[in-house]
């Protein structure tokens, strides 16, 4: 089913860290705590004007003096103070939203599945064994200072080049990662907290995007 014909809820929040809680069966559950203060609608896109239906939401208060003039005008049009982060959510019920409307963490219900999008932790420059799970070279049988090397990266005169996509050493992490079908353990609407079973991408204090599960049943 196309996302244009489905209703989605998506909110920006901040990853606070992980903890453990007990469920109704006295089982210890690892959860990630995401703080989601109210997101505000700053733009409503329509098929007639933009070619598709979606809402733009903003998150994170900033000093209005630090916003540039185009951003200030955009937020003034929506009747809200400048925010730090913006994103779009395609949804079939875009017409039900209005500029300046606040969306809280109460939009998610315990027991439902969500997808969490974030930026993975940066690991710096890493070799092929850490970055791509290479096995490495034999520890003996004449191997000399080759134990963590990748091995051959291609032939010589034919094709006389290294193929694109060759797995090699390089910067690891710091990439956009989406974790699918995480279960919402509980919602604290008063404190703006969302507890999700399992781990989500990124370090503590990083921005994450939480939405209804795209592939969840």
UniProtKB/Swiss-Prot annotation:
Gene name linked to the record: rplC
InterPro entries for this protein: Ribosomal_uL3, Ribosomal_uL3_bac/org-type, Ribosomal_uL3_CS, Transl_B-barrel_sf
Entry-linked SUPFAM superfamilies: Translation proteins
Species classification: Bacteria, Bacillati, Actinomycetota, Actinomycetes, Micrococcales
NCBIfam families: L3_bact
Residue numbers spanned by region Disordered: 137-160
Assembly information from the UniProt record: Part of the 50S ribosomal subunit. Forms a cluster with proteins L14 and L19.
UniProt name for this protein: Large ribosomal subunit protein uL3
One cellular-component annotation, GO: cytosolic large ribosomal subunit
UniProt GO BP: translation
One function term, GO molecular function aspect: rRNA binding
Function in brief: One of the primary rRNA binding proteins, it binds directly near the 3'-end of the 23S rRNA, where it nucleates assembly of the 50S subunit.
Family: Belongs to the universal ribosomal protein uL3 family.
């Amino acid at each position: 089913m196309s996302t244009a014909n489905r209703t989605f809820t998506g909110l920006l929040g901040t990853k606070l860290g992980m903890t453990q809680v007990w469920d109704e069966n006295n089982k210890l559950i690892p959860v990630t705590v995401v703080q989601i203060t109210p997101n505000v609608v700053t733009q409503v896109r329509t098929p007639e004007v933009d070619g598709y239906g979606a809402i733009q939401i903003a998150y994170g208060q900033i000093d209005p003096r630090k916003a540039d003039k185009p951003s200030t005008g955009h937020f003034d049009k929506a009747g809200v103070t400048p925010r730090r982060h913006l994103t779009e959510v395609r949804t079939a019920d875009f017409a039900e939203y209005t500029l300046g409307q606040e969306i809280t963490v109460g939009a998610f219900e315990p027991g439902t599945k969500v997808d969490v999008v974030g930026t993975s932790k940066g690991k710096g420059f890493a070799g092929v064994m850490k970055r791509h799970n290479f096995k490495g070279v034999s520890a003996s049988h004449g191997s000399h200072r080759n134990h963590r090397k990748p091995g051959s990266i291609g032939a010589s005169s034919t094709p006389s080049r290294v193929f694109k996509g060759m797995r090699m050493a390089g910067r690891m992490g710091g990439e956009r990662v989406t974790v699918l079908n995480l279960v919402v353990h509980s919602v604290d609407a008063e404190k703006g907290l969302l507890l999700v079973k399992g781990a989500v991408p990124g370090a503590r204090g990083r921005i994450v995007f939480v939405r209804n599960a795209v592939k969840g049943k």
